Amino acid sequence: MKQILDFIPLIIFFALYKMYDIYTATGALIIATAIQLVVTYALYKKVEKMQLITFIMVTVFGGMTIFLHDDNFIKWKVTIVYCVFAAGLIIAHILGKPVIKGMLGKEVTLPDDKWAKINHAWVLFFTVCAIANLYVAFEMPLDVWVNFKVFGLLGLTFLYTLFTGMYVYKHMPKEKKEEQE
């Protein structure tokens, strides 16, 4: 259910962009992201930091897009969010508080060096996505960027999550694998 909630604002953004324009879609994205935050809190009594960061970025950059009537701001939002996520993972690693281990460590037992590799891999992923977004956003037509944002980055994230899951499964202790089968 929670994963479905995460995609609703993006689906609304895409649909309204195709029906109207980037400004209508951006306004709807801000509203849908705010509603998503409220619903998530109502259902789970907590909001993840990533959701909160995304909401703040959507509101600030989306608001600037609408107020200044300049779609460059919403394009920059995607790159900045990816950079913030990458920086957050780096800082957490330096401070000895691995974020991904914190998210999955209760369900999955892995050696710390494997958690570090997963962390570094996600830093690389977010960095590549940030750079790719910059290229597509500012070198391609708006329609191409919207499709890339919705389908390209979402598809890449899904695949990377799948590959991370395969890596985790490969390195799980044998007794944990047997429990899950």
Swiss-Prot record:
Keywords: Cell inner membrane, Cell membrane, Membrane, Transmembrane, Transmembrane helix
Chief location bin: membrane
GO cellular component entries: plasma membrane
TM annotation in the entry: 22-42, 50-70, 80-100, 122-142, 148-168
Subcellular locations according to the entry: Cell inner membrane
Membrane topology category: Multi-pass membrane protein
InterPro entries linked to this entry: YciB
HAMAP family for the chain: YciB
Family, per entry: Belongs to the YciB family.
Purpose of the protein: Plays a role in cell envelope biogenesis, maintenance of cell envelope integrity and membrane homeostasis.
UniProt-recorded name of the protein: Inner membrane-spanning protein YciB
Natural source organism: Aliivibrio fischeri (strain MJ11) (Vibrio fischeri)
